[in-house]
Amino acid sequence: MGPLGRETWAQRLGTFRASPSAFMAGPEGEDLGRDLLSDLRSEKLSEPMKVALLALSLEYPDQLWPDAPAAEAAATSLLDTLVLLPPRPSALRRPLLLAATTALAAGGALNPASGASGRLLPLLLGLASGRDLGRSFCPASEQRPLQATAWECLRELESCRPGLLGGCLGLLRALLGREGPAQPLSLLLALALRNALVIQARAGAGLQGLLTAGESSMEGGPWNWMLAEEGEVHLQPQAPSWPAAEEDECGLAALELSPEEARELRATVAQLLDASYLLTPVAQAQLLWLLGWALRGLRGQPPVLFKPQLVRLLGTAQLTLLHAMLALKAAFGEALFTAQDEALLLRRLTLAAQHPALPLPTHLFYLHCLLNFPENWPLGPTGEEAAPLLLGSQLCRGLLPSLLHEPMALLARLHLLCLLCVEDEEKEGKGQDRSPRHYLEELLAGLRQRAALDGGPRALATLCFQASYLVAHCLAGQPVVLIPLTQGLAQLYRARPALAPHFVDLLDHVGPELQEPLRVALRQEVASRPGREEALRWHLQMLASVADGDAQSATLSFLRAAAAHCTDWGLQQALLRVCRALLRAGVGGGLADLLQELARQLEDPDGQDHARLYYILLAHLAGPKLGVALGPSLAAPALASSLVAENQGFAAALMVQEAPAPIRLSVGPRRAEGAVPVLRLQVEVLEPVYSLELRFRVEGQLYAPLGAVHVPCLCPGRPTRPLLLPLQPRRPAPARLAVRALYSTPSGLTCHAHLPPLLVAFADLFLPFPQPPEGAQLDFFEELWDSCLPKGTESRLWCPLGPEGLEALVSRHLEPFVVVAQPPVSYLVAIRLPPDSRLLLRLEAAQADGVPVALRTDDWAVLPLAGDYLRGLSAAG
């Protein structure tokens, strides 16, 4: 097949970028790489199109060259194309160099046995050193850009194979002295130097003259493949944190340098640092990272080499440079920073963080630096925050958190406030009016007050619990803070029991300093307030988490009172989970009486079976065996006794086990008929199920409770009828249905599973009015139209139309509700919305791109829902 045209390539590239994995799995994926390499030599394609093809190979080398042989062949072809370019200026030389380098590095083909590596490395080194390769390779005008590209390619190869350029250190150092402070060359030398120091230290060898050796003195070329093999662990050139101290002790500290090598190393580092101010801020930061890592822990190399850079950068406004400077502070400490330097830097960070015009990410960065400033680290016992050495309340007065701050900024400022609270008692003794601890208590009270708003946003509750966890973590050893925190959280639960899942999660993550008193407070709160029926499930969920052997009588009294209100399966299961928790806690006699009462009182057979099983276990097993029987079954060891195994299977058969959902439910096409809206559910069967019962719960109070749907049997591969779920809306609004399945498996086990929630759309509630007599349709509609006012409302909007026009849109979405039709430009539509609302539409004078719609309804809350529905009709198709 001949070369592809420009339009064909543009289409293929667009399809590939839309989904690379799908394209490569298709019929054209296998030939994409081969066609790309072939058409790079075609004279029919323009250079911009060839550059676009090379850009694709740079972005997706793993998809184009998935293994080492393919990468080797691709790099060879790219190098051949580079050599065959005419000597005139071309925009392809630099992308070809980058593409060949990327193919070898990403495909794992960079090794001494690779022919493409043997061709590419000398070419890159020749270009990097400025050696004249002849006018036949490239014109003089391209030599300088190609040299910079060669430096970048060598840095990429050194990053992939640390130690590869260890033999080129002397050459690169001499080249830096000759070429001046070129940014890619400086970064290349710094990376190669860092890698060589780390690898030689692990090998227990010195630098062995690597800093002074020239290219002519190297046997077998400048490529140190042995050093690269020893450095197979890929080192991050800009690591987010410094190596651990124990790594230094067995790493760079073991490097033995001769006096001459130490002198040459200092000269090389000084050479790089002295000209670093000419680099971009990002490049300067990376250079400081590399050199700081290389010299940290290296004996005989004082960090005073960085002092001129420190003086220069103390006033920097560049975040990357500030971050690198703080890394040097963490690495070298007092050996590099004086007390005056630390105070100045801390004051700069504090004042910068208070700037009112800072973007949120920058503000969070400054706060992060303050929180991780070495002199602000905790100095007390493990797990406790101690007084910071330099950070004081006067300095941080402008950084105190407020309820008006963004959540992330509030939490960061709160962490800073916790650092200051450890000195609270001392400053209170000196007569301070408003201590940090008092400010902290007021802030937490404000967060709890916002979280207690019934129906408030979930984000406010989440922020309150995040702040509570942060305070408990930072001030675990401060009872004066934890006691009011515990009391406040108990009051929050009293005001809004629906936050029970948040409380359970908090109890799972906090330490015992807050966990134990909070458990007691919440247990007392639940036991003393049975609550209304809608709050009962939250009380039971909370009690299942906090119940133990203490306060047995109050807990059992609460459960007896709650049992009368547990009428559905979900509440009964929640009640039994509390009983299970009490069983594991070792609660005795009173629980046995309660279980007997539940076995007689509960209406659901599953709940009765559970109550009887728990009573039998309590009556016949001692405490340790009872704990094992009620423990998780997944970690149970295999038992050799067939009798015991049979008993285990019998116990499992009596219990309802949670399992992955065996079916998938989706909402099918609706039919506007009947007295109530009916949701048609499509079923996809994954596993055979028997006696399936689907239970639906509406989130919120928008709908009346929904009945269960029963199906005797479902098997994969057999056609299934849609399941009909009648809806009883209390208000005409969309809803979200939580779905739970209870079923039997072919092996006889009873299981339950949670299915993904179902969404009831606004249009799923549409019902038609009774058909008026023939000839009376217009009068019927006008009577409905007039009856909506004055108690209702009306509006007008523009409904965009697709290319098929108004007639097709009405036929597809509104045909059952049309009362009067004058196609294709006018329709009168009447929709009945349960329980007792109506929505009337006049679609008249349709135009090519849309139709004006007049709406009337007797329920003003329907208006925004109707507007959203109409505006989305054209997009729905």
From Swiss-Prot:
BP GO terms, sorted: endosomal transport; protein transport
One Pfam family hit: AP5B1_N
Listed GO CC annotations: AP-type membrane coat adaptor complex
InterPro entries: AP5B1, AP5B1_barrel, AP5B1_C, AP5B1_middle, AP5B1_N
Membrane-crossing residue ranges in chain numbering: none
UniProt entry keywords in alphabetical sequence: Protein transport, Transport
Superkingdom of this protein's organism: Eukaryota
Assembly: Probably part of the adaptor protein complex 5 (AP-5), a tetramer composed of AP5B1, AP5M1, AP5S1 and AP5Z1. Interacts with ZFYVE26 and SPG11.
Function field: As part of AP-5, a probable fifth adaptor protein complex, it may be involved in endosomal transport.
Record protein name field: AP-5 complex subunit beta-1
